[in-house]
Amino acid sequence: MQQHPGNTVIVTGASSGVGLHATKALTARGWVVVMAVRDPVKAEAAVRGLRVPMEQRLIMELDLASQQSVRNFVKAFRATGRRLDA
């Protein structure tokens, strides 16, 4: 299993279903996951249940149905200074 320590990936819909399980799998391989979600409170509760380390996740609000939300997400992600690896 290839490890990716410190690399950053964005997962949309990361508060439930496939997105949440992708977050768990990616963090297990060393990725830092930007969890792009509509409801950050729901995402925090969900990820806490999976015991994903805080240093390997960043929860950010994103509603893909809203162009303004997408713009805000991009601006906020850029402000983190993180490089996007995948």
Language model regions located:
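Canonical Rossmann dinucleotide-binding motif of NAD(H)/NADP(H)-dependent dehydrogenases/reductases
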Residues: 2-34
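Short, well-ordered alpha-helices that flank and scaffold nucleotide-derived cofactor binding pockets
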Residues: 24, 28, 48, 75
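The beta1-alpha1 cofactor-binding region of Rossmann-like NAD(H)/NADP(H)-dependent oxidoreductases
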Residues: 40, 60-75
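Conserved Rossmann-like nucleotide-binding pocket used by diverse enzymes
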Residues: 10, 58-60
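Generic leucine side-chain signal with a strong bias for well-ordered alpha-helical environments
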Residues: 20, 26, 50, 62-64, ...
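A glycine-rich helix->loop->beta "capping" turn
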Residues: 5, 52-55, 76-86
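Conserved glycine-rich Rossmann-like NAD(P)H-binding loop of the short-chain dehydrogenase/reductase
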Residues: 29-45
